[in-house]
A protein has these predicted regions:
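Hydrophobic residues embedded in beta-strands of well-ordered beta-sheets
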Residues: 82-85, 154
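Short, solvent-exposed aromatic-acidic interface loops
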Residues: 68, 88-94, 161-165
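Bacterial Sec-dependent N-terminal signal peptides
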Residues: 1-26
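Start-of-domain marker
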Residues: 21-74, 78-83
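An exposed acidic His-Trp-rich patch
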Residues: 84-141
Length: 165
């Protein structure tokens, strides 16, 4: 086997775990009406894909962890009918990352950022844990929140109670 093939195999072995994200990722946090909800959706990643300067600033950390490839934990809040980013934390030591370090100052209003870049669905469980699935390595919760968002505006928000006897 020549050196080029050996190099390709080694690179593949190194990058496949990164691509597949085999390790369960630390969640972002959503605060809604006093509840703290763990998110498997990462709204800031859509902006990171579109904006290289923000992406570069988010990557400017010494934190490398297989359970947090994005290198930050986003803290979100729903206020009225809108989604806001209210904080960022480093994945390794949980220290706050200043929004001013990552975002242009004119984006920050009242110490939060309106998530006008985000359109999509957020689905998460919260409240009391009712079951654990080894197959999916996740907990199922008494309540399920489903949110449809267009350009940072909440179009639909449904909370379902799960009846698990």
């Amino acid at each position: 086997m020549n050196r080029f093939n050996t190099l390709l195999i080694l690179l593949g072995l190194f990058f496949i775990p990164m691509i597949s994200n085999g390790t369960i990722q630390k969640p972002d946090i959503l605060i809604y009406k006093g509840d703290t909800i763990s998110l498997k959706d990462f709204p800031l990643e859509l902006l990171r894909e579109k904006n290289s300067s923000i992406s570069k600033r988010l990557n400017d950390t010494s934190c490398l962890s297989t359970d947090c490839w994005r290198q930050y934990i986003g803290i979100w809040e729903i206020e009225n009918d809108s989604l806001f980013l209210i904080g960022l934390r480093d994945c390794c030591d949980y220290k706050n990352i200043s929004l001013k370090k990552i975002f242009p100052e004119q984006w920050i209003k009242n110490q939060k950022i309106f998530a006008d870049w985000y359109s999509g669905k957020i689905k998460a469980g919260f409240s009391k844990e009712i079951e654990y699935s080894e197959k999916y390595d996740e907990f199922f919760y008494k309540k399920q929140i489903n949110i449809c968002i267009a350009n940072g505006i909440i179009n639909e928000l449904i909370i379902k109670e799960i009846d698990k006897n």
